[in-house]
Amino acid sequence: MREKKLLTHSEFQVMRILWNLPAQSGFTGEILARYEDPKPAYTTLATFLKILTNKGFVKFKKKGSKLFYTPTISQAEYADTFLSPVKDTFFHGSLQEMMRFFLRKENLSEGEVNDLIQLIHEVQGK
């Protein structure tokens, strides 16, 4: 099993772009094009990609003279790595307590509440 590692803010930005790229996109220039301004320098992005590769979050293939990057972990898998310890540490492992905390803290619209109720009904139907 992969050692659980957390991403820095800058690394997470790169991963978020990679998770949302179309399947045939993944060259450094394509990743850079997805950044909002201010964009990092090309060499800075290349450094982030090298770090992410070393951490095991990204793999690459050489295509011609360029490197093609793909994530090795899905966004959902990373979210679990990040959120499970929060649930365990702050909410004694209880998803119900974690949800209760956020539902009381957030000011949800009626539509958002209805969406959550619908989601609960979908889960109950499984």
Explain the meaning of each model-derived region.
Residues 16-23, 36, 103:
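Short, locally clustered residues in the helix-turn-helix/winged-helix DNA-binding domain
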